Design a protein with these regions (language model features):
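Phosphate-group recognition and catalysis centered on beta-loop-alpha active-site segments
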Residues: 2-5, 9-22, 26-286
């Protein structure tokens, strides 16, 4: 496929952007959103599966969104499995172009008046090295949009890209002196030589590390392990996220989220945007 230029993509996107940026009166984004702080610890797992990718998460004030990508030719297509890919659903069309337009409209930030970057977690589903190198070429077209790391020094931008998924992406990333993306580490990376300037986030599968799923009492040994993990990461300037936590609304999910909150986890992983928003608001967590 021919690679669509940023200018062409933005021109095509502009026809619909105005409607997206000005949702109907009464929506959270149009009315209440501007008066309520973003929920920086809220992470939209598989965000692209919502009716309005990116914008549904922003409507619920989320601070992090996740997009799975496949390298097909020179295009980065967004989807969970290869058989559901649509050539029209690219990383540019669903995320990069809308974010660029939002940041321009909001004078340098995704959420107007809040300078903290939005996290874009990009989960690579195809071979990591080649996909990352193509992704890097795409990211270069968006000057001044992203947090960068130049020679070990981090320069904040409106959007921070964090690369997850296939671990082979690490090799070309480590070879770069200037990056527009950061690495999503695993618990096995804690305490290694990877600094927070390379791996600011540590994510792992909850159910491969803990047995408790929110019912009954949280075993004390597991609670101490959780707090130890978070403390170790925070001491190195890294943030922590767990995926595969219970996500069915009910007491078990609330109990587990409460333990994560008490332990100081940095991102709550969910498909239920409204449910997590309500939980964090009830606990007055930004």
């Amino acid at each position: 496929m021919a690679l669509v230029t940023r200018r062409t993509a933005l021109t095509a996107f502009g026809a619909t952007l105005a409607a997206v940026l000005a949702p109907p009166a009464g929506s959270a984004f149009a009315d209440d959103h501007k008066h309520r702080a973003p929920l920086w610890r809220a992470h939209a797992h598989n965000d692209y599966e919502h009716p309005r990718p990116l914008f549904d998460a922003l409507d619920h004030r989320f601070g992090s969104v996740e997009a799975d990508i496949f390298l097909v030719g020179d295009q980065l297509l967004v989807g969970h499995t290869a058989d559901e890919l649509d050539p029209k659903r690219t990383l540019e069309s669903l995320y990069l172009d809308p974010l660029a337009a939002l940041v321009k409209a909001n004078h340098g930030s995704v959420y107007r008046g809040y300078r903290r970057p939005l996290q874009l977690l990009i989960d690579i589903k195809t071979e990591g090295s080649s996909t990352y190198l193509e992704l890097d070429r795409h990211l270069r077209r968006y000057q001044h949009l992203f947090t960068t790391c130049a020679h070990g020094r981090v320069h904040p931008g409106a959007v921070t890209n964090v690369i997850s998924g296939d671990r082979a992406a690490r090799i070309p990333m480590e070879a770069q002196s200037v990056r527009r993306a950061f690495y999503d580490g695993r618990l096995t990376d804690l305490g290694t030589s990877a600094p927070a300037s390379f791996a600011p986030l540590v994510s792992d599968n909850w159910q491969l590390n803990f047995t408790w799923l929110g019912e009954g009492t949280f075993p004390d040994a597991e609670r101490q392990r959780l707090r130890g993990i978070i403390g170790q990461a925070h001491a190195r300037g890294q943030k922590v996220r767990f995926w595969n936590t219970p996500d069915l609304a009910g007491p078990a999910r609330d109990a587990l989220w409460a333990e994560l909150l008490d332990a100081g986890v940095d991102y709550f992983n969910t498909d239920d945007l409204a449910g997590l928003e309500a939980f964090l608001d009830a606990h007055r967590v930004a």
